[in-house]
Every structure is written in C-alpha cells, then in structure tokens.
Swiss-Prot record:
Biased composition (Basic residues): 1-16
Function, as annotated: Binds 23S rRNA and is also seen to make contacts with the A and possibly P site tRNAs.
The encoding gene: rplP
GO biological process: translation
InterPro entries named in the record: Ribosomal_uL16, Ribosomal_uL16_bact-type, Ribosomal_uL16_CS, Ribosomal_uL16_dom, Ribosomal_uL16_sf
Residues in coiled coil: none
A Pfam family matched in the record: Ribosomal_L16
Protein name: Large ribosomal subunit protein uL16
UniProt-recorded Gene Ontology molecular function terms: rRNA binding; structural constituent of ribosome; tRNA binding
C-alpha cells in the first residue's frame, strides 16, 4: 500500500476540497486515463483496490501508472471516545483529489480492454469520474 516513508509531522490539518485541480490534468504516460469530476479524499486502500482491479483485468499486457499519492494523514478518535481530549491518532492516508485531476493512466492495450479496466477501477473510487483518451475528450 502507498504511504510516505517519513513525514515532518505526524498529524496534519484536513486539506481543502474546493476548486479545480491546478496541475495533473493531462495524460502524461499512457493512452487512456481516469479523470475526476468531483472533489474527494481517496484513501491508500481505494487506490490499491483500483490498481488491483485494473491489473487483474489487463493480465500481462499493458502498463498502469498511478499519478496520485496519499501523502496526508487523516486522524480519528476511537469508537466510543468522548468529545475533546486532543486530536485523534492517524487512521489512514489520503490523497486530496480535486475535479479535473488525472488519477490513473493505462497504456499498451486496445481501447476496449483499457475502457473496461478503467471502468472497473472507477467502481472502487469514491467520486464521479470519466475515462479520457490521449487524442482528446471522453471515450
């Protein structure tokens, strides 16, 4: 699973989810990609589930690139804890994804296989997404 090797601080503020993505809006590596249409926090487990869904479908052909990284810790209090008593312990790592961000890219496979693999990965993600091609536009 994806987590940072080390961070300067153990706990951080929650990131801002408003606004469009400032970078990472274009396909850089593959031929087809998943682009987010809504803001969301994507956890390291969701990224891993989407990666496994894609790689199992394409089998040995093609290549998958993950262009987001969960670099922010999200904290939670234990269940049944009373209010107060400080900030909770880091529970999981998230990537702050804004609308327009390209999250996964795929290359080296036909359009039909890429489309189905990316559709399976979209089912694992917590927001609305679309599949785009390098030539331009939706598929």
């Amino acid at each position: 699973m994806l987590i940072p090797k080390r961070t300067k601080y153990r706990k951080q503020h929650r990131p801002v989810r408003s606004g469009m993505s400032k970078g990472g809006n274009e396909i850089n590596f593959g031929d087809f990609a998943i682009q987010s249409l809504a803001p969301a926090y994507v956890t390291n487990r969701q990224i891993e589930a989407a990666r496994i869904a894609m790689t199992r479908y394409i089998k040995r052909g093609g290549r998958v690139w993950i262009t987001i990284f969960p670099d922010r810790p999200l904290t939670k209090h234990p269940l049944g804890a009373r209010m107060g008593s400080g900030k909770g312990a880091p529970e999981f790592w998230i990537a702050n994804v804004r609308p327009g961000r390209v999250m996964f890219e795929i290359g080296g496979v036909s359009e039909d296989i890429a489309k189905e693999a990316l559709r399976r990965a979209i089912d694992k993600l917590p927001m609305k997404c679309r599949i785009i091609a390098r030539e331009g536009g939706d598929i």
